[in-house]
Curated annotation (Swiss-Prot):
Disulfide bonds: none annotated. Keywords: Cytoplasm, Methyltransferase, S-adenosyl-L-methionine, Transferase, tRNA processing. This is tRNA1(Val) (adenine(37)-N6)-methyltransferase. It is an enzyme of class 2 (transferase). One of its GO terms (cellular component) is cytoplasm. GO terms for biological process: methylation; tRNA processing. Belongs to the methyltransferase superfamily. tRNA (adenine-N(6)-)-methyltransferase family. It catalyses: adenosine(37) in tRNA1(Val) + S-adenosyl-L-methionine = N(6)-methyladenosine(37) in tRNA1(Val) + S-adenosyl-L-homocysteine + H(+). It is found in: Cytoplasm. SUPFAM superfamilies: S-adenosyl-L-methionine-dependent methyltransferases. It comes from Histophilus somni (strain 129Pt) (Haemophilus somnus). Pfam families: MTS. GO terms for molecular function: tRNA (adenine-N6)-methyltransferase activity. Gene3D superfamilies: Vaccinia Virus protein VP39.
Amino acid sequence: MAKKQEFTFKQFHINQDQCAMKVGTDGILLGAWANINQANTLLDLGTGTGLIALMLAQRSPEHCHISAVELDPQAYLQAKDNIQQSPWANKIKIFQQDIIVFAQDCEHKFDVITANPPYFKQGIDCASKQRNLARYTLTQSHLDWLNAAEKLLNLTGEIHLILPFEEGKSLQKKCGLFCIRECKIITKAGKTPQRLLLSFSREERKCEESQLVIYDRNNQYSTEFKTLTQDFYLNF
């Protein structure tokens, strides 16, 4: 089934006909869950439609500065347009660049960094090179993404990611940062976790563990999911 070419939230609108990766639950979860308390500078890596950057802009105080990075030229232009049409056009700056190159060249450090990185390993080719680029882990691993984020992170900053469950568990063992929050995402009550929301820091502290169920046993959105995302979804 074809996904919608546009998506309207309570305070902003997303056009996505030029983006390989459309608005999805993963991005909405991350944008709503990431801890941005006391953050002044925020960065979204691989911004796609600009969804997470816009969610962070909605959630953060007016004085905050948000940067977003997107490699694909079509997605970059559409994200830029989505941002310009939003209430936070002066709050968000977007860059068309590879995240590894951006991490090497950028002189600024950030208090909060978010990323919803590609997660399907290369197998059957996607219908377009654009979607291939957006969806598959081709040349950059999840560890590459985390390492790039670490280079851009303030000493007391936090990195927030969403990943498939097994990949998220594997990344925790490989990286040199401390996992300080972990939320298991369960699509439907009674099922096993499919995703992990993760927060990393340079500072060691006890990891806060939780879980979130999206649909209850009656196939209705759970109270916890609606509570987390109610500032964004029109029907909550």
